[in-house]
Amino acid sequence: MTIHKAVKRITASEIRSRKGQEPIVSLTAYQAYSARIADPYCDLLLVGDSVGMVVHGFETTLPVSLDMMILHGQAVMRGSKRALVVVDMPFGSYEESPEQAFSNASRILAETGCSAVKLEGGVYIAETIDFLCKRGIPVMSHVGLTPQAVNRFGGFKTQGRNESNWQQIEADAAAIEKAGAFAVVVEGVVEPLAVKLTQMLSIPTIGIGASSQCDGQILVMEDMLGYGTWVPKFVRRYGVLEQEMEKAIKSYADDVKSRTFPSDEEIYKLKQKSG
């Protein structure tokens, strides 16, 4: 009898213990197939509300619903075995009260099987993070450029360009650490501030457009694979998959029009009559 050894999934506490150790490798994932490919190489897969912009074509993350996040969270859990899967709580699903946040976060964990959620914000959301953590829901937070606050920021703008603005971001990071978050995404802040946050916090910082000195890095998978024409400054492209996809689709279209697809080897034929 063949015995299959179960793969142990990384936990939130294990991610927290990686502070100052080997950098944490993270990517976004929205589908089972991409999660399956990324899983052996990533410590953490984030089912980000960026799915609204990347997959569904929204201009911001604001229209993303809780049901959408659960659907994509289920897909990523089915595709992965090893990485810690964290699901974003979408705009409007946690800001009203800690009780609202717990109701929706517990639904995410129960219906997807994931092990943690991510909330944007700092000081103002610390009470909610504390409420969730004390009730058994691991929380990763997100400071700096927080996409759900796009209207308040007036767009997707780098934070901390003036040192006079650092104090609020530092206060946000300290508040979510005290509240019990196991890690924090630091997005779109100037490099010296990202380094300072990494040094002052006892929990891992996971950078995106921040600093190589963060405790880990995360990118939108489609960005680093080479989909789309606009490339943010902080993205390094490791592939050109959009061009490859277009090339393949064009070849398919040409073959269909020329009737060279399907070929004899790609169609089913009648069985030969015996006798």
Swiss-Prot record:
What cofactor is needed? Mg(2+)
Output the Gene Ontology terms for molecular function: 3-methyl-2-oxobutanoate hydroxymethyltransferase activity; magnesium ion binding
One term under GO cellular component: cytoplasm
Tell me the Gene3D superfamilies matching this sequence: Phosphoenolpyruvate-binding domains (3.20.20.60)
Q: Which residues cross the membrane?
A: none
Q: Origin, by domain of life?
A: Bacteria
Q: Which InterPro entries match?
A: Pantoate_hydroxy_MeTrfase, Pyrv/PenolPyrv_kinase-like_dom, Pyrv_kinase-like_dom_sf
Q: Which residues bind 3-methyl-2-oxobutanoate?
A: D49, S50, D88, K118
CDD domains tied to this protein: KPHMT-like
Where is it located?
A: Cytoplasm
Q: Known SUPFAM superfamilies for this protein?
A: Phosphoenolpyruvate/pyruvate domain
Q: Which residues form the active site?
A: E187
GO biological process terms held by the UniProt record: pantothenate biosynthetic process
Under catalytic activity, the entry for this protein gives: 3-methyl-2-oxobutanoate + (6R)-5,10-methylene-5,6,7,8-tetrahydrofolate + H2O = 2-dehydropantoate + (6S)-5,6,7,8-tetrahydrofolate
Q: In which pathway does it act?
A: Cofactor biosynthesis; (R)-pantothenate biosynthesis; (R)-pantoate from 3-methyl-2-oxobutanoate: step 1/2
| E.C. numbers | 2.1.2.11
Q: Does the keyword section mention Glycoprotein?
A: no
Q: How does it assemble?
A: Homodecamer; pentamer of dimers.
**Record family assignment:** Belongs to the PanB family.
Q: Which NCBIfam families does the record cross-reference, listed alphabetically?
A: panB (TIGR00222), PRK00311.1 (NF001452)
The UniProt function text for this chain reads: Catalyzes the reversible reaction in which hydroxymethyl group from 5,10-methylenetetrahydrofolate is transferred onto alpha-ketoisovalerate to form ketopantoate.
According to UniProt, the name of this protein is 3-methyl-2-oxobutanoate hydroxymethyltransferase
Organism per entry? Bartonella henselae (strain ATCC 49882 / DSM 28221 / CCUG 30454 / Houston 1)
Q: What is the organism lineage in this UniProt record?
A: Bacteria, Pseudomonadati, Pseudomonadota, Alphaproteobacteria, Hyphomicrobiales
